[in-house]
């Protein structure tokens, strides 16, 4: 059972990257179930690949009345991210990073971020992203981790609370659809074999 307090979390403010309007995160699940994808940062190559992966579900989510929303911890890189078309849902910014804190998405430090970013799984996904033409950069907050939160309509309950243990962690697409009780006709991207020459972007 998730320990997330949706009442207190729901009062946190997010900035809509299209309108600039500030909204409570709770408004995103008031009228519909929602998949909230929390990115580490918008310039992260691995995050962009993950965004493209979860976006494969957008059509099926929409057909079931479920919203797909991306949330980043800062403005840096958001225009390039949106222009790149990596993500098919609405995008918000948690400027205070309060949602990240409340959901237990950890912050790395200067010592542990390097081994985390150079891990085999990170390099494998970076290699896959490069093969698919997805590039990245090192702009912005390199220390924040992310995850995912899926909330039932009306904030009835948390359906999935996923916390990254490493920068390459992401819930499989089938885990997302299972949590929502829907089926989707999509093919998940294959995890590539590690290439020692590739490092995370």
Swiss-Prot record:
Q: Which InterPro entries match?
A: PXL2A/B/C, Thioredoxin-like_sf
- Its main subcellular localisation, reduced to a broad class, is cytoplasm
UniProt-listed Pfam families: AhpC-TSA_2
Instruction: Respond yes or no to whether keyword Lipid metabolism is given for this record.
Output: yes
MF-aspect GO terms: oxidoreductase activity, acting on the CH-OH group of donors, NAD or NADP as acceptor; prostaglandin F synthase activity
- Gene3D superfamilies tied to this protein: Glutaredoxin
The SS bond pairs are: none
Which reaction equations make up its catalytic activity? prostaglandin H2 + [thioredoxin]-dithiol = prostaglandin F2alpha + [thioredoxin]-disulfide; prostamide F2alpha + [thioredoxin]-disulfide = prostamide H2 + [thioredoxin]-dithiol
UniProt feature coiled coil, ranges: none
Question: Which subcellular locations apply to this protein?
Answer: Cytoplasm, Cytosol
BP-aspect Gene Ontology terms: prostaglandin biosynthetic process
Q: Per the UniProt record, which EC number(s) apply here? A: 1.11.1.20
Q: Which GO terms describe its cellular component?
A: cytoplasm; cytosol
Q: Which UniProt keywords apply?
A: Cytoplasm, Fatty acid biosynthesis, Fatty acid metabolism, Lipid biosynthesis, Lipid metabolism, NADP, Oxidoreductase, Prostaglandin biosynthesis, Prostaglandin metabolism
Q: Which family does it belong to?
A: Belongs to the peroxiredoxin-like PRXL2 family. Prostamide/prostaglandin F synthase subfamily.
- Please give the function described in this protein's UniProt entry: Catalyzes the reduction of prostaglandin-ethanolamide H(2) (prostamide H(2)) to prostamide F(2alpha) with NADPH as proton donor. Also able to reduce prostaglandin H(2) to prostaglandin F(2alpha).
This chain belongs to the protein called: Prostamide/prostaglandin F synthase
């Amino acid at each position: 059972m998730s320990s997330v307090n949706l009442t207190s979390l729901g009062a946190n403010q997010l900035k809509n990257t299209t309108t600039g309007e500030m909204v409570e995160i709770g408004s995103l699940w008031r009228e519909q179930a929602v998949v909230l994808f929390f990115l580490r940062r918008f310039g992260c190559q691995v995050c962009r690949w993950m965004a493209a992966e979860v976006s494969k579900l957008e059509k099926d989510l929409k057909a079931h009345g479920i919203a797909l929303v991306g949330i980043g911890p800062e403005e840096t890189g958001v225009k390039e991210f949106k222009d790149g078309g990596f993500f098919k849902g609405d995008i918000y910014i948690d400027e205070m990073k309060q949602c990240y804190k409340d959901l237990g998405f950890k912050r790395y430090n200067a010592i542990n971020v390097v081994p985390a970013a150079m891990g085999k799984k990170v390099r494998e996904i970076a290699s896959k992203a490069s093969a698919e033409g997805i590039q990245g950069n090192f702009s912005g907050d390199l220390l924040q981790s992310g995850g995912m939160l899926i909330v039932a309509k009306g904030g009835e309950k948390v359906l999935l609370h996923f916390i990254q243990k490493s920068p390459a962690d992401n819930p499989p697409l089938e885990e997302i659809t299972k949590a929502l009780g829907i089926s989707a006709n999509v093919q998940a991207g294959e995890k590539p074999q590690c290439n020692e020459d590739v490092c995370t972007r």
